[in-house]
Amino acid sequence: FRWKALDSLDGTKQKVTVDTLIEHWRGELNRLNADVLEGVPLTDGEFDQVLMKVNQIDNSYEAAKLLAMEQSTGKIDGIYRDPHPNVTREQITLTIFKKAHVGGGESSYHIAREVESKYGNRFDLVLLINGLPLINIEQKRSDKSLEEAFRQFERYYREGEFVNNFMAFSQMMVITSEVATRYFATPKSLNDFNESFVFHWSDRQNKPVNHWEDIIEQFLMIPRAHQMVGDYLVIEEAKNEENRRHMLLRPYQVHALQAIEGAALGLDNKDGIPHGGYVWHTTGSGKTITSFKTALFLSTKVGFDKVVFLVDRKELDSRTSESFKAYAAY
């Protein structure tokens, strides 16, 4: 599967607005939910109900929780159907996202270019998965700094672009030029724009990947882009509301999880023999998140009935348990 560039979503060929994306999403909802809809597409009134619920999504963090509902199958419930002779269900729940359908299944992938908003801003590139604007990309010339692109996203947020509307579904922001690229989880508030959580992509040897062609192939192509806003996204439902957020894994964490998968399932050797191994993380590099994601991954695979987490200091026990509970809420 690869990204498809439809003329109807190309703002360099015709005017494309956020409303255009919303109408495209409506078609995707009808496709994904054909059985639930009993072959009768959403009416204007029914889709208005959907949009009312979308406009209640405060920010990207709340959207992340919605997308992770019911074993990572995002849903919107409580939609009442209009009378129709072929409709037997009075109320329905619509599926909007399936994390497990990476590079196949029912997932679709489209690129929208030069998308105008009602605030007069223009999004350079929006990557749509099942019609949802999950990844936003801001492009700059090589003589411009990536900080300028970062501040541009910050300004968009200040003007209301990513709150209580369709664009609140954004989960990852990418700032890029021909010679440099960085990514970060879409902040849940203006105060959460923090350059300390802006990462570069790197390969398995931890060598930074910067050239735009390499970034496309190694980071923004399917399946990796879908995985970044699915498998490699962590929702932290902390006790304190100010600490609640969603996070994207850093590249070395992604490579670590892939290495663990290869070792545990025997995918990294020609004989297909599972074997052990270890992941080397330094202090402050996200060991707890990597451990949680490892345990979660193995627990979903056949042949792994129990995952044991061993800590070498007593004070780490309660701290790790608290973190795992926060990560496991969604």
List the model feature ranges, each with a label.
Residues 3-306, 315-330:
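ATP-dependent helicase/translocase motor core
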Residues 309:
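Conserved, well-structured core segments
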Residues 312:
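Short beta->alpha hinge that forms the Motif I/post-I loop of the SAM-binding pocket
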